[in-house]
Design a protein with these regions (language model features):
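PAS-family sensory domains
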Residues: 2-5, 83, 93-99, 112-113, 117-127
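Sensory-domain boundary capping and coupling elements
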Residues: 106-108, 125
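PAS/PAS-like sensory domain cap-loop motif
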Residues: 45-56, 167-179
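Conserved hydrophobic beta-strand signature of PAS-family and PAS-like sensory domains
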Residues: 29, 36-39, 151, 158-161
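N-terminal capping loop/helix in small sensory signaling domains highlighted by a polar->aromatic N-x2-3-F motif
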Residues: 33, 42-45, 164-167
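PAS-family sensory/regulatory domains
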Residues: 55-69, 177-184
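Sensory-domain boundary/capping and coupling elements
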Residues: 4-14, 132-146
Length: 184
């Protein structure tokens, strides 16, 4: 009977080790203590951020943030929530080892001990800088088109959804006068 329990536990541990290994292979992972000091960072994190282990371990989380964010109320709130066991996720602007902006799609995960007390925070992240740059370039192109051309948008039934300022100025209307009206 005990051998069966031990075998089940061994299988569970092996499976969990495999899952952790998969995460470490595919994601940037960093661990912080509750003061925001780096405890450990995997190779993916170090490579993504441009740091060596010696440069990262023992450093404050703020080191990876923009100076503005590191001094903000949002930063204080982030760590307050984490210390209270609240998971946080999103797209975060950070700064790499060369001082360049980098965008991370990340989750901050409070880790609790057996008594339910938060003891550290583990961050799982993926570099989405290229995606953010593409979105920024696409938005810049759309804004340039909006400034250069008269644009009006219609619903499938022919009613006006919106029009840009160039269209409104050239046609002598306000958006309120056109919105919802049929194009005829």
């Amino acid at each position: 009977r005990h051998k069966s329990v031990i075998d089940d536990l061994q299988r569970t541990l092996t499976e969990q080790a495999g899952l952790l290994d998969a995460i470490n292979r595919s994601m940037a992972v960093i661990e912080f203590d509750l003061d925001g000091m780096v405890l450990r960072a995997n190779d993916n994190f170090l490579k993504t951020m441009g740091y060596s282990a010696e440069q990262a371990i023992g450093q404050a989380h703020r080191r990876f943030c923009t100076a503005e964010f590191g001094r903000s109320a949002q930063y204080t709130d982030l760590w307050s929530r984490l210390k209270n066991g609240q998971f946080q996720s999103g797209t975060f602007e950070r700064v790499d080892g060369k001082g360049q902006p980098i965008w991370l799609e990340a989750s901050y995960n409070p880790i609790k001990d057996a008594s339910g007390r938060v003891v550290k925070v583990v961050k799982y992240a993926m570099d989405v800088t290229a995606k953010m740059q593409q979105e920024s370039e696409a938005n810049a192109k759309l804004q340039a088109i909006d400034r250069a051309m008269a644009v009006i948008e219609f619903n499938l039934d022919g009613s006006i959804l919106t029009a840009n300022q160039n269209f409104l100025t050239r046609m002598g209307y306000t958006l309120a006068e056109l919105k919802g009206k049929h194009h005829r």
